[in-house]
Amino acid sequence: MKLLVIGNGGREHALAWKLAQSSKVETVFVAPGNAGTAIEPKLQNIALTAHQDLIDFCRNENIAFTVVGPEAPLAAGVVNDFRAAGLKIFGPTQYAAQLESSKDFAKAFMAKYNIPTAQYQTFENADAAHNYVNRKGAPIVIKADGLAAGKGVIVAMTLDEAHAAIDDMLLGNKMGNAGARVVIEDFLQGEEASFIVMVDGNHVLPMATSQDHKRLLDDDKGPNTGGMGAYSPAPVVTPDVYERAMNEIILPTVAGMKAEGHEFTGFLYAGLMIDKNGAPYTIEFNCRFGDPETQPIMSRLNSDLVDLVEAAIDGKLDSVAAEWNPQTAVGVVLAAQNYPDSPKKGDVISGLDKANQIGKVFHAGTATNEKGEVVTNGGRVLCVVGLGDDVAQAKSKAYEALETIRFDGMQYRKDIADKAINR
């Protein structure tokens, strides 16, 4: 069979790579893909992004099903368009994707269905937002309502930072339309985890747990990013936390969407904050697999991903199970110079073959120049994954592979997975 994956990041490289491991698969097309998907066995890039062009391609190539990687096409209704054309696709509808594309929608939904999350209020007026923050005090969290590539959240430790974030979004147009409304919520303390499941509208199949590292610099310093590394499994998600996350967050969300008349299908990602008592709170929802969490999670999946996606599309997720490698996977992101503000592009990358002999390199912001060299082409450039019998071994493997790679201005965190090692 032939499949299509929409997107061009590390998440899409990992999903396409895992789908291609199925004996049922002849080719996985990636639209538009990157320099890594261009050379991966059984993968083929296609330079298409418009929904109608993708629909025509799927019809002409007899594509069995499509998996959507990033949030932007979901928010733009790609699932609705494919379904209207009678094509199989795994992802949420435009309405359901509002759980990610509008923070205000998600918070109102959580309030309605009693899903644990931080107290909040939404503002379009800067003066009202400033007054609210003055009343609440710091630390406090300011979020752009719309999609901002993981960079629309400011954890303000002081009132000055909070007021500056409000002005940037509501008056300075720093986030464009995404920041025309802001959600201001209480600061939650605890340890974060990524809880990702597959949903077919009614049934839920949990993926392996993971923990992301959002901040640019070691010790969780610096600005928020799309994610600088992740590991799986996440020890903070104990069996008790797992049970509570399923019963208090995931299942009520799936039931709530159904009650709204919009069944949720696709990957559902709950970003959790787990407090000192082991109570999980929802920081955010994403309507797709996380990036970089996908890379370590897919590195541990022993099951045929094609079988799981087919079951989900057919509404039969209750008939399949996911088998996992008991090893730990650690993924470390290599970012371009000046990321996250204005990443430098076009720098030649060396050492990829050697790195792939030690671990697995998933490409994100990469392209090929006219000489055929792999070059930087985005903020987060690569994610290097190492597997090991414990977290320390997996971390060591990932960094051993990473150290063979070179490009100008390369930046990465040196403490990915240390929280798990130091537990």
Q: Which residues does each PLM region occupy?
A:
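ATP-binding N-terminal substructure of ATP-dependent carboxylate-amine bond-forming enzymes
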Residues: 1-94
